[in-house]
Amino acid sequence: MKASLLNKLDTLQDRFEELTALLGDAEVISDQARFRAYSREYSEVEPVIGAYKEWRKVQDDLEGAQALLKDADPDMREMAVEEVREAKEQLVGLESQLQRMLLPKDPNDGRNVFLEIRAGTGGDEAAIFSGDLFRMYSRYAERRGWRLEILSENEGEHGGYKEIIARVEGDSVYGKLKFESGAHRVQRVPETESQGRIHTSACTVAVLPEPDEQVAIEINPADLRVDTYRASGAGGQHVNKTDSAIRITHLPTGIVVECQEERSQHKNRARAMSWLSAKLNDMQTSAAQNAIASERKLLVGSGDRSERIRTYNYPQGRVTDHRINLTLYSLDDILAGGVDAVIEPLLAEYQADQLAALGD
């Protein structure tokens, strides 16, 4: 193992011992915020230290077996040869595991997200495809045990959505969905197409991590214009008879967020403010760290076809992610919620890039 990695692991070992002592300290235990922070860090470091201890044990076993290679007894030497081979195999696997564990963690990976899907070029067909994408992510959320709630929706005239915004809550939501941001292109024959010609449409997807209270941007109330209006209801006994829907405009940036799904104006306002904070945080982060653009491959733009990150070709049953030249002929499975077929190779490619940088 490289000396630089060993140094990192030794430093982490010292930190682990320090955290163990801190979590047993009465002063820390009485401070819930500090105790939670140290507990979170401890849970992240513990598996790394466990793997490092195993690596050191196998390293000791290897050295012991290598010493036996000089034994006068041929049976002992034969046994030592086998032990050396097994130890070397184990070390390769453990070193690879430790390298992955030492990769820089995205602090947002564990966060909930705001999922924004908007129809781009293609008119009615783009809106219909927005609906298809939303169903795909909804089914994916179900598979992962996540909770998805719609905050705002603007339906298309012939189905689907011109725009739909949802909040997704669960385990490692942003970590899984962060590379879904970008323009998604669809190629298919619309139901209204009598000549059987394939049309191309596009939608944009934005995935914004929901900031927690510690990192949320402080918003000056004077910078906000808050409008209330009557949410569109389905009629009957549940029709919304009060102005519970909220529209908030952030005057300095022109960002507008709306939330109309809750019957309580207070809840809609809280959701809208959280979403606004996420959008402002994303804007600030993108401006400060343009390097993020290279990780996300392509930031969300106008929804124009030229900005595509992924193509869904219905006649061929094909999905192609253009960032990693991945082509899969399992369109139906992916649209049914099997998005991991695309997400996992993307994450693996990103991890490979990180490992290459770690090696440098």
Curated annotation (Swiss-Prot):
Chief location bin: cytoplasm
Residue(s) carrying N5-methylglutamine: 237
Subcellular location: Cytoplasm
One GO cellular component term: cytoplasm
SUPFAM superfamilies in the record: Release factor (SSF75620)
Gene3D superfamilies linked: 3.30.160.20, 3.30.70.1660, 6.10.140.1950
Keywords, alphabetical: Cytoplasm, Methylation, Protein biosynthesis
A GO molecular-function annotation: translation release factor activity, codon specific
Post-translational modification: Methylated by PrmC. Methylation increases the termination efficiency of RF1.
Described purpose of this protein according to its UniProt entry: Peptide chain release factor 1 directs the termination of translation in response to the peptide chain termination codons UAG and UAA.
Sequence similarity: Belongs to the prokaryotic/mitochondrial release factor family.
Protein name, as recorded: Peptide chain release factor 1
Source organism per UniProt: Pseudomonas putida (strain W619)
Organism phylogeny: Bacteria, Pseudomonadati, Pseudomonadota, Gammaproteobacteria, Pseudomonadales
